[in-house]
């Protein structure tokens, strides 16, 4: 009877701790969601700059068709969201595991920050390079760009010698800097916020929490 009572008390405590863990994981999801939205805003900016830079090349029926232009931006948002979701997958799994284990170390948030900065920087570089590339070839960057790697000096001369490329380069660099600063600030803020709500959970209670979902 005492054993059953003790087990019930542990189960009740586990349910209370589960609510705290859910709150912590909700904050982790909010942290990832904000970074996701910020990244989508930058992707939208790149698409807007690309659209305005090549608007003169469109036929009149497309230039005056707002519905078609809006549909194109929505499809672009869908594509950008797919890319951002792929980037988001690993941090989401990591934060789910750390929330389940009630382990919220600074190095975890630091790793996630570096991960986001690296992959979004690569994405922004491609998005920025796509602006002059599309202006020249009227198609987005694809695997054919690797053909230019064999002419490094020539390619560098074309990029640095063309003044119209300066703005996309500047846009890419400033986007990387702004996103990096935002990610680092958000990581620091949510790290302290989540740890302020942390609680001590015994292994038995943790098993009960895992069993109850």
Where is each model-derived feature located?
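Residue-level signature of transmembrane alpha-helical entry/exit and packing/kink sites
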Residues: 27-35, 168-169, 202, 206-210
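N-terminal-proximal low-complexity accessory segments that begin disordered
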Residues: 33, 37-50
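Hydrophobic cores of alpha-helical transmembrane segments in multi-pass inner/ER membrane proteins
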Residues: 83-95, 170-185
């Amino acid at each position: 009877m005492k054993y059953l009572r003790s087990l019930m008390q542990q189960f009740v405590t586990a349910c209370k701790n589960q609510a705290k863990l859910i709150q912590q994981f909700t904050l982790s999801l909010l942290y990832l969601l904000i970074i996701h939205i910020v990244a989508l805003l930058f992707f939208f900016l790149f698409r807007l700059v690309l659209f305005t830079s090549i608007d003169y090349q469109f036929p009149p029926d497309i230039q005056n068709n707002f519905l078609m232009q809006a549909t194109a931006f929505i499809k672009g948002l869908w594509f950008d969201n797919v890319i951002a979701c792929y980037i988001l997958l690993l941090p989401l799994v990591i934060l789910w595991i750390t929330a389940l284990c009630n382990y919220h170390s600074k190095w975890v948030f630091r790793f996630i920050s570096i991960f986001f900065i690296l992959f979004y920087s690569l994405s922004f570089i491609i998005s920025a390079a796509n602006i002059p590339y599309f202006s020249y070839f009227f198609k987005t960057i694809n695997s054919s760009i690797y053909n230019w790697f064999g002419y490094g000096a020539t390619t560098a001369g074309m990029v640095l010698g063309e003044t119209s490329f300066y703005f996309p380069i500047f846009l890419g660099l400033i986007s990387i800097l702004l996103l990096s600063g935002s990610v680092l600030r958000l990581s620091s803020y949510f790290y302290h916020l989540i740890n302020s709500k942390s609680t001590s959970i015994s292994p038995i209670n943790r098993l009960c929490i895992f069993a109850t979902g």
